[in-house]
Amino acid sequence: MGGSGDVEHRSDRSPTQRFFSTRVRGRVAVATAVLRIATGLVFVLFSLPKFLAHEYELAEFVRYGLPDSSAIVYLVGALELGAGLMLILGIGTRLAALGLALNMAGAVATAGVQVGGPFHLGVAPALLLSMVYLVWAGSGAAALDRALATRFAPSASRGSSGTS
């Protein structure tokens, strides 16, 4: 991989700046963006049956040991759709990834335990690890988070001293 310049370690930023910033640079930032966008697309696709094949998804949730509640299926679908779109756009990446990491932890703990198999014990844990990485790394390249990090930067760090 690249040198030590591929990972940023800065503590002189505000919590808001750190929330919207990315820890990675260069090729690692590009790879992180590819991971972010690809997993965002996966979650958007996973959300659709929760709305379009709701009764089937509800029966699956019951099979996984969850309560017989349409609200749970709709909430999970809304989380996957909303957070998946956030990942694709690269906005609020850490927050979206945290919500989806909790979702995947729940999927492994329910469907993984009740059903098992390569999907629930392979894909779901891989998505969980991907989300944990995005919580740590941030959005990578080509993300709206980067523009927001710049917007929230103190004026001195943006090169504006306030005088002409």
Task: Locate each region found by the language model.
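Short juxtamembrane and helix-loop transition motifs at transmembrane-helix boundaries
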Residues: 54-65, 82-90
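Extended, low-polarity transmembrane helix blocks
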Residues: 1-52, 71-78, 82, 89-164
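Structural signature of hydrophobic alpha-helical transmembrane segments
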Residues: 61-75
